[in-house]
Amino acid sequence: MRDPLGIEQLAHDAGLSASRRYLVDWERAEAAIGTRLPADYKEYVHWFGPGGFDEYLIVCVPGVENSNTELAARLAHEHDGARSRKQINPGASPRVPLFPEPGGWLPWGFTTGGDGLYWVTSGGDPDRWTVAGRPGRGSDRAYFDGNFAEFLHAFLWDTVEMPFLPEAECDLPVRFEPDTGKWRTGGAGEPLDACGHFALE
C-alpha cells in the first residue's frame, strides 16, 4: 500500500485548526453501503465532517440529514439515475459501472457542476482503491492514480488532472467550507433520519 498523505495535514492546508470531531457509527454506515470503507476517508470524516471545498467540491458523509450529501443515499441516487436512463434508452451503455458490480464505482463526492467522483472498488482492500470521475454531461471517464486523501491533497493545490475539473480561481490551497449536513427546506435532496453527530465539547 502507498504511504497516504495525512488527513491532519490536509485539514491544516484546508484551513481547519482542529478536528470537527464528527462521529459516525461505521458498522451501520458500512452495512448501508455493503462494504468496508477506506481508512483515510473515515479519518477525513472525523476531522472535516459535512462540507466541501471552494463552494464547488462536496464530499459525501454518512449519517447526515441531507440525502444529497449522505454517502449511502448518494449511491442509491446514482442507481436510480442509471435505471431511469436505461428505461429511456435501453441500448445505452451505463455512464459508469456502479458498485456493487465487481470493480464498480462507489460515489464519494460531486461538484456543483454535476461531475461525479468515485472510488474504483477493484481488489479486496478498500485502502488500495483509487479515484475516478465523470463529467456532469457525456460519457467521458477520468482516472486519478492515487487514493482519496491523495486526490484531495491534489485538489487543494490545483494539481488534479481531470479534463472536466477547471483550474481553481481562488487562492491556494483551496479552503474547506464547513456545513451542518442538515437538509434545507426547498434545497436539493430529501430529509433523512440523521445518525451522525458532532462530539459534544
Walk through the language-model features, giving the residues of each.
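Compact, glycine/acidic-enriched structural inserts
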Residues: 133-163
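A short, sequence-level motif marking secondary-structure junctions
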Residues: 122-126, 148-150
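Mixed-charge (acidic/basic) macromolecular-recognition segments
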Residues: 148, 157-183
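Residues in flexible loops and secondary-structure boundaries
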Residues: 45, 66-67, 116, 127, ...
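A short, charged helix-loop
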Residues: 128-132
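Short, surface-exposed beta-strand/loop micro-motifs that present aromatic residues
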Residues: 115-122
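A surface-exposed partner-binding patch
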Residues: 1-113, 164-166, 170, 188-201
